[in-house]
Amino acid sequence: MRFFYSLLFFFISLSFCFCQPGFHFKKDQKKVVIPFQMINNLIFIPIKVNGETLTFLLDTGVEETVLFSLDDKEEVSLHQLEKIKLKGLGSSEAVEAFKSSRNKLEVSGFVDEDHEIYLILDQEFNFSSQVGIPVNGIIGYHFFKDHLVEIDYDKKKVVVYHESNSKVRKRILKKYKKEEVSLENNKPYYYTTVVTVQNPRRSKMLIDTGNSDAIWLFLSEAPNLVLPSKTIKCFLGRGFSGNVYGQRARMESFTFGDTTFKNPIGTFPDSTSINSVSFVSDRIGSLGGGVLSRFSVFFDYPSSCIYSKPGSKINAPFNFNMSGLEVQHDGLEWVTQTYQERNGTAAIYTTKQSNTGHLQDNLKIKFELKPIFRIFNVREGSVAQLAGVQKGDRIVKINGRDAHNLTIETINELLKSEEGRTIVLEVERKGVFLTYKFQLKSIL
């Protein structure tokens, strides 16, 4: 699955005591280029907050800037704190937070000296464990609102253009598909054609870079949309106030830009998970990173439009996790390694691999912090559950590879790689090492 998913809906309705001037170029620049890290179709960029570099999810599906984790930072100064309540996906209960004003945000010479930030204290909302890197917050509308912003998923870079840069507009008009968007509650919406079962429907969708799935559809908002007959029940993620569940199914088709995708995987959240969500008029779903990452996309909020051009992944199949396992990062552990230098190179052995009872003179020891991965959820009836894998198991090896040398993304890519692939999983459960074997099976 795509663990992030639900976080990505923030529905904040608040009053403001002053107007922010917004992001602008610090120097006389035509553009700024920001490299990003992409994990599970999500975009993570470094931004300095009052001088401290933090990692933010770049999310068109949110309005305000949110901080929810500072675990990897010794100290971050926030100014003018005011206690508030936030409500969002998961349940009707509000979450305690603080609003902070007059903060300075800066990335690559793109700066806002008067930025409002919302700080969430509930550490259960921290999703760093799901993506495997420290993530401190989310930034949305205020990053996009005054400039032309390019997201190049192939090159993994965000480019922000100065409003006077006319050359780039001429270029994109020649090579990119233009579509009108409406900015409602400071989030971009557009109309497209959705076919779940047979009947096409013109549908209003949120363009949501903070949703790692391809498509989310809310059946409660579109009674004439038919849920496909073959579905799987899934844990979709965590919202402001609790876990979010729903179903996944293959739809007939979905159109974005000049491309109509056949048999994409649609996600259908349970109605109980969206009870507290206030939808804009006529909206029935979201378009997420599972589709957007197949394109190069320009967001032009000042002109209320977007531009898209197919990228290298345009024809990639829509796969899903066939194992039924949800894996999360569960901290770090010290791993002892010995290595032998050979003509300027080094052969590395873990303590398990060397296992000689003594060290040779030319072997050296080093200690490294390595990630721990644990099973966070096991889908009912999945091949992994039937094999015996349980929630809470710590992953030791996958197909002979030490788990601590992998990333969450490589693990997830393996678990959705191809039907029939054999997975040999070595886990540790309450001090006992167990091995399970199963084959990936597509049920959609």
What residue ranges belong to the model's regions?
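Bacterial Sec-dependent N-terminal signal peptides
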Residues: 1-24
